[in-house]
Swiss-Prot record:
The keyword Membrane applies. Gene3D superfamilies: CD59. It comes from the Eukaryota. Expressed by the venom gland. This is Cytotoxin najalgesin.
């Protein structure tokens, strides 16, 4: 599954790239 940086709940479901998904989410939220 690809992490959707537009959905804050979705990055939590990313098992391998949790930190990466979180960073992408934060960057898109800047």
């Amino acid at each position: 599954l690809k992490c959707n940086k537009l959905v804050p709940l979705f990055y939590k479901t990313c098992p391998a790239g949790k930190n990466l998904c979180y960073k992408m989410f934060m960057v898109s939220n800047k």
